[in-house]
Swiss-Prot record:
It comes from the Bacteria. Residues 3-167, 180-353 form the EngA-type G domain. Associates with the 50S ribosomal subunit. GTPase that plays an essential role in the late steps of ribosome biogenesis. The keyword Nucleus does not apply. It comes from Solidesulfovibrio magneticus (strain ATCC 700980 / DSM 13731 / RS-1) (Desulfovibrio magneticus). Pfam families: KH_dom-like, MMR_HSR1. GTP 1 binds at residues 9-16, 56-60, 119-122. This is GTPase Der. GTP 2 binds at residues 186-193, 233-237, 298-301.
Amino acid sequence: MPPIVAIVGRPNVGKSTLFNRLTRGRRAITHDLPGVTRDRLEAPAEIEGRFVTLVDTGGMDYEAEESLARQIVEQAEAALVTADVVLFLVDGKAGRTALEDDLAERLRRLGKPVIVAVNKVDGLERVAAMTADFHAWGLPLLAISAAHGQGMAELAEAIAERLPEAEPYDPDAPLVQTVLRLAVLGRPNAGKSSLINALVGESRLIVSDIAGTTRDAVDVVVHQKGKRYLFVDTAGVRKRTRITDGLERYSVAKALSSAKRADVAVVVIDATGGVGVQDKRLISFLDSERKAFLVAVNKTDLVPQKDMLALQKDIARELRMCSHVPVLYMSAAKGKGVAKVLPQAEAIWAECQIRIGTGELNRAMRASLDKHQPPLVNGRRAKFYYLTQAADAPPTFVFFVSDTERVRDSYIKYLENSLRKLFGIATAPVKVVCRASHKPKDER
């Protein structure tokens, strides 16, 4: 397991900017507003030839009384417990604060290597003036500019010097590979973080009744039965008219981008609110992208039993255009029904990998084509010559026909349903494409 380097500090000192700089990617959301990072983010980074896990934490404010602020501090403290090296980031322009004096003393008591990185120091001539105050702590100190990349080489060297010795390579050690990458989507406060916490078995993500608690896409690894699952907990997707700032707009865009990169998406719906407009749009987006997904109806413990049948009918009605999508009913807070999520996602992904030979495809589909021929369009009927599977994930089938304009959407849906029935594709998305082609020479 690679050593862990945690970045901590008060709000808005540039922790996420430094995180993005060291991981060589714009992975954490950065913004001028304090408190942008709420959960702790993890990503691999290479420091002086050593691979480490870098952890970005939310701003630590021990004086804050709000529940959300306290949970942010708890997440940061959890990162400190597992850290091998701590980067204590401070703002050189703002100077030392009483809050940071308190935090410095707490870090000293940890007994772990701590490096004070004085950020926002632009220009060598200002180093002495902007770092003078921070020497009072008696901790190793460096001046950097995360935004402009200044001092990064010195910082990397200081980190590398404090890393624990690398574990010897064991060629017989079993390799644990990621089975699935899953994106968790849904409206704000639907219970996405609660679902992941229930699967992990700890409060890995901040859970709050304040809508919009999660702003970044946070990767969380779940180990179950010797398998490794990578979950991405995403910002809530809400109506455009309710997105009040640029930060939240970027969070939503990143959530949808995470869904595209995932193997399987999990759409979390709040059972107490039913299927909302944004739930419908999100499902429509995933269906149009032919993305593998399942629906997790959360908070069923808060729905009276007499209303459950109406809820199930409502969800079935909204999924009628993508009836292959599995629906799970659960209560993440109570831990009920959660155990079905990973096996179901794995089953969907297994179907996404299906490969069918061209000969087998054509023999099996010939009966379906003969039984239900394409309808006449302007007095003529499209001729189907042959088909082949062009790709998997999702399974994509290309039909070569005489005239694509004579193939109606309803007939394409019939072809999709026939393929599902013939080859046992029950829960994965299926993509059917018709391509114009001349009649094969051996049929002329």
